[in-house]
Amino acid sequence: MANVIRNMNFKPILEKINYERLSEPQPNANVNVQVWDEMNVSRLRSDAVKVTLTRFIKPDPSCLFSVEATIGVEVIINTAEYDALEDAVEYFKTSPISRVLVNNIVTILANLTTHSQLGPIITAPVCQFPQ
């Protein structure tokens, strides 16, 4: 299944950003920042799919801010190879496409959170899919 992606020439496009400022944490409270990703693959036409990656940053307990960012890319595919995939999302999770998307989204989120209460949130440039 190595030939699913026909053309590695693509341009990631920012789809959506949702930043919500929340209340300050309680004094001496421990705040854990939860980070996770979701991926979606949808067919655009017979020879192309759209791959989107959404990264969520949510503090626990809910305070400071909440961020959700989605970036996507149109990928030209080999139709026969793609149609033979058992799970397209699982394929793209481990493809170079996911690495490009996550690297772009990490940079966007670091810039977006520069002026937050915690300063820039630098998240790992690897996809973090829930198990």
Regions found by a protein language model. Name each.
Residues 1-100, 107-131:
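N-terminal intrinsically disordered, cationic/polar leader segments
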